[in-house]
Structure formats: C-alpha cells, structure tokens
Amino acid sequence: MVYSYTEKKRIRKDFGKRPQVLNVPYLLTIQLDSFDKFIQRDPEGQQGLEAAFRSVFPIVSNNGNTELQYVSYQLGEPVFDVRECQIRGTTYAAPLRVKLRLVSYDKDAAPGTIKDIKEQEVYMGEIPLMTDNGTFVINGTERVIVSQLHRSPGVFFDSDKGKTHSSGKVLYNARIIPYRGSWLDFEFDPKDNLYARIDRRRKLPATIILRALNYTTEQILDIFFDKVVFEISNNKLLMTLVPERLRGETATFDIEANGKVYVERGRRITARHIRALEKDQITQVEVPTEYIVGKVAAKDYVDLESGEIVCPANMEISLEMLAKLAQAGYKTIETLFTNDLDYGPYISETLRVDPSNDRLSALVEIYRMMRPGEPPTKEAAEGLFDNLFFSSDRYDLSAVGRMKFNRSLGIDEETGSGILSNDDIIGVMKKLIEIRNGRGEVDDIDHLGNRRIRSVGEMAENQFRIGLVRVERAVKERLSLGDLDAVTPQDLINAKPISAAVKEFFGSSQLSQFMDQNNPLSEVTHKRRISALGPGGLTRERAGFEVRDVHATHYGRVCPIETPEGPNIGLINSLSVYARTNDYGFLETPYRKVVNGQVTEEIEYLSAIEEGKYVIAQANSNLDEELRFTDAFVTCRGEHGESGLYRPDEIHYMDVSTQQVVSVAAALIPFLEHDDANRALMGANMQRQAVPTLRADKPLVGTGIEKAVAVDSGVTVIAKRGGMVQYVDASRIVVKVNEDETIPGEAGIDIYNLVKYTRSNQNTCINQIPCVSLGEPIGRGEVLADGPSTDLGELALGQNMRVAFMPWNGYNFEDSMLVSERVVQEDRFTTIHIQELSCVARDTKLGSEEITADIPNVGEAALSKLDESGIVYIGAEVKGGDILVGKVTPKGETQLTPEEKLLRAIFGEKASDVKDSSLRVPNSVSGTVIDVQVFTRDGVEKDKRALEIEEMQLKQAKKDLVEELEILEAGLFTRVRSLLIAGGFDAKNLDKLDRTKWLEQSLSDEAQQNQLEQLAEQYEELRKEFERKLEVQRGKIIQGDDLAPGVLKVVKVYLAVKRQIQPGDKMAGRHGNKGVISKINPVEDMPYDENGQPVDIVLNPLGVPSRMNIGQILETHLGLAAKGIGDKINAMIKQQQDVAKLREYMQKAYDLGHGSQKVDLSTFSDEEVMRLAQNLRKGLPLATPVFDGAHESEIKGLLELGGLPTSGQITLFDGRTGEKFERPVTVGYMYMLKLNHLVDDKMHARSTGSYSLVTQQPLGGKAQFGGQRFGEMEVWALEAYGAAYTLQEMLTVKSDDVNGRTKMYKNIVGGTHQMDPGTPESFNVIMKEIRSLGINIDLDED
C-alpha cells in the first residue's frame, strides 16, 4: 500500500484478514444528498422546491378568467455566514425569490384569448440552508433533522392473528396507504363479510365502494366469481364439469357419463378420479335437480315477455325458482362457483348485507359516514367521493406508492398514476379474497421493504407544500374579488404562511433536534439516526415488540446493536456503515456479485425487496487466490433471511465487509464479536457521551474506522487541494497549492482559519489545533488540523489507561473504580466546559432597564470585576454569586416608609426607583470569563464596552484580511518574479525595485507579456476584492443587531470551567463496562509491577464474567502488547541505535499475524522511519476490525515481540506494604472514556430555598434549588424507630409549617436552637379540598 507523507507519520497495524473491497462511504451522505435534492432545480419537477411549486401552481380563479403561473425560483445568498449566525443567534437561511406570471384572459373573446400578462419576482420567505456538515443553524443553535422510518405508501395485506374475535378466527384485512390523502381499508368480519373503512371511520360493506364506482350487482358477481353452468334439456339437469373444481369434495350423487360411473355417491373425490375424468374429456355430467338448490344465480334473469325480473342476481335458487326459470324459457342457468374450502362466497354474502342498491344510494351512504349530520345532495356526495381517491389535488400515492402497489398486486409496470383506478380497488379486493381463500401470504409490516426513509429534503418539501396550499387559498379568494387591473403578483402573495410553515418545521418539529455535540462521533451518529417516531410515525406507547425487534432485513441496513435503552428501544435506530437510500427511499446495502462460484469485483446495491430472491454468502467465507469459495458448503442467507448451507454454484452474492451489519458507533468497538449484545449496545451508546479531553490520545487498540469518523464528522480541517504548508499558527494554516491543481488566473493559495475555544451545544469546548508543520507536503483530503477528540486525524474519545483487574479494599465494589492520582496530575481526563450566560435589557412599562455599574445596595467588592459599563472583564475568575453584568430595572412607585424618605432626601431619586436585576454566576459554577459579546438594538446608543468590542473586531477583521492579502500577494509576486527572470531580467536588479514596479516591466516574448499583464490584472483584482471584503465586514460589525421585540441590549458572557476528574465522575470502557470513581488514590499506594510501574486504574474482575463482555479482556491484553512494543521502540531511540535496527524491529511488528495489510518500511526514507518511530514511542496503534479481529495466537505473538509474558498476567506488589500479591494479575491498557455525567453537575445541597405555592413545601430537583423528598416510606421508618421529635420536625418546620420555619430561622439567628411547630400547610390544603366538596370542616383546639 502507498502511504502519503501525512499517513506515514503514524501507521496503524491492521489485523484484518480480508482486504477492503469497498471504502467506508462518506458518512453524512444521507443528510447532504437529501437536502441537495430539495434545493437544486429539478428539470422534471419530480422533487424538491420545483415539485412543490408545480403541484400548487398555476392557481386559477374560480371563474377561470385569471391565473397565476409559476415560472422559476431562485435562492439568494445568505447575509451572514454560519459562524456569524451562531454568534448573533439568527437562522442561517437564504431568501427565496419566485418569478410568477399573472395572466388575465379576455372573457368577451374566444376562450384562451389573453388580455394581459404581468411577470414579477416575488419574495417568498427564507429557506434555512444546510451547513457543510449536514446541520442547520436555527436561532443560533445547531440542529439536526433526523430521518424518519415510516410505513411506505402502497397496499398492505395483514391479519389480526386471531386476536380480535373470541373464537380465535383469523380476520384478514387490506389497507391502501397513499403518500397524502385518505386511507382505504378492507377487512373481513367474523361472519366472513367484507367491509370497507375510509380513514379508519365506521365500516361499510365493501360492495358500497363498488356500487359507488357504478358497478351493478351482476357486474360485481362477474368480477369476483367463476361460473357453474347448468343446462335444462329433456327434463334433465346437466352441469358443465370442470374436474379440478371437485377436488376434495364428497360426491352427493353418482358421477357418471356414458354409462361409466367415475365416482360413487358418498365417496371423496381424489386426484385419481379427476385424472380419469380429464382423460375421458368429460365436460358435462347429469346432476339431480336438488343439486342446484341453494346455488346462487350469477345474473338477473328477466321474463322476456313481461320484462319482469324472474330471478335477480345473487338470489339463491329454489325448486320453485327453477320451475319459473324453465317456464320463462331459459335453457341455461349460470350460478356462482363457491365451496367451503378455497372459493368462499364472501362478496355474494356481503351484497346481502349491503343497504344500497344503486350508485346514488351508495354515494349517499358514504357521504353520511364521512360527514354525519349534513344533509346529502347528489352533487355533494359525488364531489366528496371523487375527491377522496380520484383527485390528484387531494390524493397522491407517489411514485413509491404506485411501485409498491403494482408489485403487491403482481403488475409488472412500476410506474403509473398517483390516484386510484377502479381496477386498483378491485385488484386489492381480489387479492384479499385470495388470501382469505388460503392462496397468498399476508405482508410483514416490519420488513424493510415495507418501511421507507423520509429524510430532510422530503420533509421540508412537504412542509413547504403545506405553506403553499395556504397561500393558494388566499390567492384564489383575492382573484375572485375582481378588479385585477392594478394588481401585481406581489400584491397577491403573502409570504407569511410559507415562512411560518418552514420555520415551524425547522424550529419545533419532533424530528428537528438539538444536535448532540458531545464529540465527533455523537455528531455523526445523530445525523445518521433513523427514528420511527415523529409526525406520521409511531408513538412510544402504541409500539409493540414486533416493531422494535431486530428483523432479518435489518442486515446491512440498520444496526441491530445501537439503539437507546428505555422507552425508545428499537424505535430509534442507526444506519449501518455501508447502507444508503435508493431513489424510492428504501435502504440498500452493497454486495459483491458472485458468478459460477467465483466472486467478482462488481458491487451491487440491493434493497430488502430485491434481496429476498438471492442466496448471499457472509463476508468471512473462505476464498482462494482466484476468489473462489474453498468450502464445499458455505453458510449463507437464503430466502426470507434464513441461514443455511449452500453449494458455491448456488450463491448469487457475497457481503462486502464484516463491518457491514453494524453502525459507525458499534464498528468502533474492538473485539465486538466477543461481547454480549446488551453490553455492546451500552458501549455503542456510551461512546457518544464521552467528553473531549484536554489532550486527545489515540486508542492503542482501535478498529481502523476511526479515521473515517474523524474526517467525515467535519470537526477536523481537511485540505481542499494538495500543496505545501507555507504558514502555520494556532489560528490559521496557509497552503501553497500544487501547480497542477491551481485554476489558471488565481493566486494558488488556500487559507484555512481554525475554530478556537468555542462552545458546543453540550457546553463542551470546540478547539482546532494544527497537526502539520511548516514546509510539509500535503495531499488533497488530508487532515491539516485536529478538532476536539481527534488525534492526527483519528477519532480519540478517551485515554489509554494502564488497568489491573483485581479487588482493592472494597474500592471497586459494584463497578466502582479506583483511580491513581497520577491520572489527575497528568491532566489525562481534564476537560474544559464553556457556559454561555446572557443578560437581556428590556423596555418595560415603567421605563427601560439599564446595564450599568451603578447598582443599588451592592458593595464595592462585588463590583470589582466589572468595567465602567457594568460588564465583567475578560480573564476575570468568577465564582457562584458574582455579578457578571450589572443591570437595574425600574420599579413601580410604592408608599414610602419614613426611612426611605430620609434616604431619598439624602441621596436623591436614584436610590429608590430601581431594583437590582443583575446577571450573576449560578450557584454551583465557577470559572474564567473568556469572551463577552454585546448586541445593541438598531437605533440604541452603544455603550463604551460595545464600542471597544466593535473596534477590536474591526481591527481583527482588518488584520486577518491584510494578512490574507499579503499571503496572496506574496504568492502572486513569486510567480511574477520567476516570469521576469525567465524573460531575461536580472534577479539582483529586480530585488532592488519595488515589487509593484515589476508589473510595469515589459517582456519581448508576447506570450510572457500576456502572462505578465494577466498577473497585473489579478493584482488589481486582489486589491479591489480586499477593499470589498473589508467594507462588507465593517458593515456587518457596525450595523445594529436584529433583536427580539422589546429587547434593547443583550450581553453574552462565556465562562470556561476546567474540570479535573474526581470521585463520583462516571467513566466507561468501550464494551459497556461503566462505573463511578470511588477514590483517587495516591500513586505510591497503587499496585505496581516488578519495574516499579504503578497501574492507573484498578477494575473489579467480577464485572466481567456475568456481563459476558470478554472483549475488554482481549483489548487489555492487546493494549499491553502495543504498549510493550512502544516501550521497546522508545528504549531503542533512547540508546540511539541505528535506523536499520529500528526499521527491522518495526517491520517485524507490522508483519506479525495474517493481516491483509502490508507495510513495507524499506520504501521509507531514514527520516520517515525516525518520525514514525517517534510517533510509536507511546505504543504501536493497532486495528482489529469488527468480526475480523486479532486471533489469540496473534496477541501472544505481539506480547512475545514486546518482551512480555504471553499469559497477559503480571506479578504485582501492594503499594502500601510492598508485599507481592498472591497470584499474577491481568494488567494491560484499556481505552477509557470520561462520560458527560459529571458529579459537579449533579451534586447539589439546599439551604433555604423556594417553596411550592399551594402546599408550601420545598420544591424538588437541582434546577429549582430543591430538597430531597421525605416520603411516605421514610415517615414509616421514623415511626418504626419511634423517633417522635425527629418526625415532628420533618413534618412541620422542615416541610410546610410556614410560621414555624420563620420562627425557627429567627431562633437560630438569635442563638437559641428551639422550635415551635405549628399546623402544617397541608392540613389547610386538605381542609380547603373538603370544603370544595361542600362539607364545612373546622379544626378546634382543645
């Protein structure tokens, strides 16, 4: 494998046996592609904004004289970029302008004669834009729109599995679900009649729907039944015989023909009898007259002379009726063919319970059911029924729905109309009856072929369409008012409903979620999440086990492991690593094609619907050199996802990768195959809660997918083009682009500005650090700077810790952990948290609030950290209760006490009419102020601090732009210089000249002169662009801010809090092995090995066997080996051994095992080998891919190479006594994460705080500064102990005895510690409740 310069810095040894056929795809595709489809103009108008506009426009007035036509739309440029929107708290959105045409027709002339056309661009609100990382910035916060897994439109056949009726009879049903419009259900009742429901309302006999479609009884019977024809001749009754129909019946008479008896009376008709009848080609057989009795007439029989109906269709034939028919001259009688086994009389029976008898009565019946209480008219009933399923405005199956519908009914055509046809409805009824007759299967609604993904673009389009429909109503009204001569499209359209619909969706939809920004993995996972909840989806309470369960079709599409614990389990899933959605929204997964037992390089994506037909081998099937299966029988998934053994020539496809089954988070767990699924679930979920540590540390034992996650998450800085690093500092990287990648006529310089110490949604710290040095060559797509939780472009969520599995004085009881003090000293798990606190000055009825340092009744000390504007300094160290922003609020005039009058006389007005409403640091918080931002409303005078900040920002912006200009100029002049020297100028003379003069020189060669002129033009362009950018930045900084109504000023203060690890913090490994720190132990007391090296963490060995997550033990052993090899390399570097020895040792390490990755260090230069060795001093990074990881023999080999015992166990000594522990202990390196459940955020103690208004009891919870509830059971405990005084105190002064607690407070202040308990407020509450029931009750004192 060829490594780039950057990749050579640190190579991860891969144990994967199977070569990677397909690279991990870009992980955010599902979000970005979906939104692109929404925004990009689609010439066909099938999707996105274009589809929404075309579906609503043209809007025609009610009289048809005017219409408003849609021409095209265009999205403008957003005013502020993403970063500015986050700072200002605005939405990152682009204005939508639509070109509309208002056409008036001349009503006096011929139809279609145009009288007037007005065309105009109309503003239609703003559309939020997606950032490059798949998020939206809404009101300054980053949000993610989660994709939804909902039931695909189409038709579904299902059964109640015998649960509805007490007899346990299975009732079948069919449901036609459109993309938008009314649902149509057909269902059998226990009496086997077929009913229909519209929108899950009251049921009607299904034949009413058919009558409403204008079918007569005769036509209905003709569609659903085969006929049996009886012939009357010579007083005999002959029946046309179809032998196959008789199978399984008992003959009620001798079946004979031509004198030969085929079946005797009372015998059961078997296949042998049928064969004999078919062989002799018997087509008619004589039957006794009684045989026709009870059969049902298939059509109306009319007396031809009188026109009177002798026998209506669907009437049972009796002997009298037979006589009448014979009398009326009918020689043949058609009856319905039914039997008890597989041709049921369902439609015939349903017609008997159908109250309607023609189209109108059916329509009226439907109208009554849909609109009870309204008087039906013919037109209203017809209009309602047509609008239900046959109007493209109200009903749309969508392309997906039509495809699913046609597939379900076995129609080959995949496209078709979006509305239902008569054939569609009849087809569904026919298939449902077939299923009831025992032919055909019901659908599995949890099959991923019946559930599809709705992503951002589609949901936004639906919301946009809803907004447009609201506008359409208003426009129609306006058009029908007449007087349209002076009206322009702008006057007709009100953009409010559209922006309201879009805003509501992005701001408050259940699927628009506050982005989980704990670390890069949690960001990626959130964007790849698939929820079954949300509008049009399931609800938590109603979802049963089947929906939540893992389904065979989840394989390679949805992760079977990663899902939340708790009420949402199984309803919120994660996309598998390689999964993608197809055009219809169904999930697909890639497979390698297999031809005649040989695996090809061709890769095909299959959806769950297609996959069912094929036999698919697993990714770990054994292949030879020619990619043929080596085993005679291979374990594969056959039809219906069942596993079985198949011969190689029966196999159609093979999995692409062993990671194919799981999601990104689960694919990051090494040795996942050795963990129990429940623990793996916890491991996958807890990695998302890891807080980025101060210094990221790559995992020694990884899975090889870390790079993809870090790069795709967008937290790192990626090179857009290859080149040479020209300048690096903490906040900027400049790259001089390679000549072959530059566009002619540009400077060829890329500038990357880094994000420094900003706050994430979870209050963690986002900071980017360059990981390249000056002069390094870099390629396109390589990592230039690490973000939070990344190390050299690899995901690094935690730290490698030296762990020992052993008990230690009960400090690791019940999953707690003993941690060495060294971990704290080295700041291994120190994290930075940034909190945003804001202070808002509003305009109130009594006057406006003011931000000032002049606050009443506050001492000098409290104001020491504020400047003259009343805002805290940057760099101030503050703690709970300190004032950050001084603010005073005017208060209403009240009756003054004599003291206040005196104060007013002495100090003037100010002291009395305002109250202190300053922003203070919350109780449990302390930290350093790292930034202050002041936003002032347009037209309000800026204070001194705001002007200072503005000036600073201007300076910074100018400095950045000047530096950018200088870099670009330098690049340009370098090219000018080389051009002039090539044209014959002397370098020394050139250097004496001013650089700008170089551009004025002339060259003899025309081509060179042209080039020089081009460069001169570029130089001018650069200067102009600089001026323009500076002006734009200046405008943005100086302009007033758009604040909420009534807000004059907003001050935001950012506090950085440094949190070291401490007892009570929650930590976890990657295998679901979580625990709380019980004690930070001095290093000298920790167990140590023979070399005197102490362990960092002591874990409880009892946490492993019962939990069955053995992966952590294998990780520990492999981590020990990795560290051992690192130690060896470190020792060799310290001894200054020559490069050849280093190269040889490292080559041994990379060659060990049977991995498919080959690292050839002989192609590396000595310098590259040394740099690689330097980066491996802390340990050799290893990758053990999921389901294809390191074997026991390989782990032992690595341990040997590192000079360590192959048992993975080491003799340890007690740090306190120095004695040897009685047996060797498992010691190694495990990757530990610090989770975002910090004891500082949870610990809380209440002194006097707030009380509930009604009960007067203290509130509960940290947010309310509440107390602990002393509940019913706790009272029992005190009663049981007989602790009467304690009990009295608990129930009175410490709870809700208002007077008692006031007295108690006075007593404590006065130094006497006694209490006078009174009546608790709850007694008053219960008395009031009893009085509210009309019973007077009083408490008497004895």
Curated annotation (Swiss-Prot):
Catalytic activity: RNA(n) + a ribonucleoside 5'-triphosphate = RNA(n+1) + diphosphate
GO MF annotation terms: DNA binding; DNA-directed RNA polymerase activity; ribonucleoside binding
EC number of this enzyme: 2.7.7.6
Pfam families linked: RNA_pol_Rpb2_1, RNA_pol_Rpb2_2, RNA_pol_Rpb2_3, RNA_pol_Rpb2_45, RNA_pol_Rpb2_6, RNA_pol_Rpb2_7
Domain of life according to the entry: Bacteria
GO biological process: DNA-templated transcription
UniProt xrefs under InterPro entries: DNA-dir_RNA_pol_bsu_external_1 (IPR019462), DNA-dir_RNA_pol_su2 (IPR015712), DNA-dir_RNAP_su2_dom (IPR007120), DNA-dir_RNAP_su2_hyb_sf (IPR037033), RNA_pol_bsu_bac (IPR010243), RNA_pol_bsu_CS (IPR007121), RNA_pol_bsu_protrusion (IPR007644), RNA_pol_Rpb2_2 (IPR007642)
One cellular component (GO) term of this entry: DNA-directed RNA polymerase complex
Keywords for this protein: DNA-directed RNA polymerase, Nucleotidyltransferase, Transcription, Transferase
Signal peptide: none
Function: DNA-dependent RNA polymerase catalyzes the transcription of DNA into RNA using the four ribonucleoside triphosphates as substrates.
Subunit-structure text: The RNAP catalytic core consists of 2 alpha, 1 beta, 1 beta' and 1 omega subunit. When a sigma factor is associated with the core the holoenzyme is formed, which can initiate transcription.
Family: Belongs to the RNA polymerase beta chain family.
PANTHER family, A to Z: DNA-DIRECTED RNA POLYMERASE I SUBUNIT 2
Protein name: DNA-directed RNA polymerase subunit beta
Lineage, opening ranks: Bacteria, Pseudomonadati, Pseudomonadota, Gammaproteobacteria, Pasteurellales
